[in-house]
């Protein structure tokens, strides 16, 4: 590591604390309260307190520290992480059939994230604002309105970007974690007996004593690790080392101290179960704690919103979602984007959730099922990467996968009990997103296959046009081509109806590679097919936004000059008709028509000047 890198490590570590750990860092606000609230048939008993604390501690060690921090984060695509990245990596060295299975698993995981993300801002902010119940019980009716106001402000500022505000995130979250540690240590000092719960004996004893109920109670324990996927998803922003250093040096110690501090408080004062987090603080510090807790939960919500934007962009670029407007809010950081449609759809969903559930305890009953489902899928996909890509020993990978699933599957199974009490919400939202993504991908493939059924060879057509050329008009025509060696529909229809051809024709294909970025040296490939025909293939990563003006600037540097304002861009606009299908495929076809009708048009998608675009319509039956 260079000196510069060494100097930047503390800064990157601090930044990671501010963004990556917001969700898992605000879990102490509600986790232990939900574990011991009496919903499982037992109250604040010594064995129950020790059992829950032991389970939380070892879950943080095994699932977060070992599985995610140590193992899963090894799987990166040019430094990038996330469930769709893991899906892509897992499918590289497998059979076509296995790749299809892995793609389905990855899409389910991504869909689960969309389902859970509606709950995260609501439960985080509400649990902070509920500190009002401790400061002034008569203000409890204001919890829902204040929560909505706070989140409204957060969603409104998204279009302006979070660059300036984001600079405050890291110091605020560092203060938050230090407060967690100090408050927890203060309580542990007053009742050090609680440290016995570090012994895994108490976790085992908890299951033996409470039997079936203890299994169901795992649904509350999992609240302590919600947000764990963010460690992997945000890897590309900060790198592995800063995220790992932040976890082991600041986040993990602070969380453990605070959870055990709450446990120590409850052992002495069981009545504190109404809100053990805020009751850890001395009375004079309640208002400052309410303020810092609200700020921390807003930051946690911001991290989730940014995560949704990033996942959506990746899904769009990989062809699983329809094109939509993506606005870059920073000229310096490509990761800072704003997607208006997703922003306001998420905002409306969050407000509906807050109004419907009214209290964070009610939301906790819906929280966790999608998170644990994603954890199961992450274990399977990462084990596939270890075996197929890294060529690890088959026995070792098998034992490791069994160990992970022995934790993940019970956690997921325990959360299935939440379906009736609210777990149906993230599952339903996830199912909708999975349906949308698979519909767009499959119907788009069906459409392209239908359009290319004419079977004419591109080379043969070009040869024929050169031998018997139609009327030539001056200038350059660019035809957007979705695939190589396929005649663009717009070119066919221009020849059929207008019976003319430009002096110079460029067939442009924009391709998304299985990488976050493509180096400018590899951006453009130019091939002259005949004296008047050129093929240009422009490659982009899934974190990049295609820009046709940039493509032709690169072409000019490589000898194919093309002035944007003297070039005509021909595109086909398909008018779709649903053919004879079974009823369920007709429904899918209608959903695709709806998605296409609202998709971003190609000129806007590729930043082509509107006055240079000519769209030729065609009717296609799918």
From Swiss-Prot:
Its main location: membrane. The keyword Ion transport applies. Pfam families: K_trans (PF02705), K_trans_C (PF22776). It is a multi-pass membrane protein. The chain crosses the membrane at residues 9-29, 49-69, 101-121, 137-157, 163-183, 213-233, 247-267, 276-296, 337-357, 363-383, 395-415, 419-439. The keyword Membrane applies. GO terms for cellular component: plasma membrane. It comes from the Bacteria. Keywords: Cell inner membrane, Cell membrane, Ion transport, Membrane, Potassium, Potassium transport, Symport, Transmembrane, Transmembrane helix, Transport. PANTHER family: LOW AFFINITY POTASSIUM TRANSPORT SYSTEM PROTEIN KUP, OSMOTIC STRESS POTASSIUM TRANSPORTER. Belongs to the HAK/KUP transporter (TC 2.A.72) family. This is Low affinity potassium transport system protein Kup. It comes from Klebsiella pneumoniae subsp. pneumoniae (strain ATCC 700721 / MGH 78578). The gene is kup.
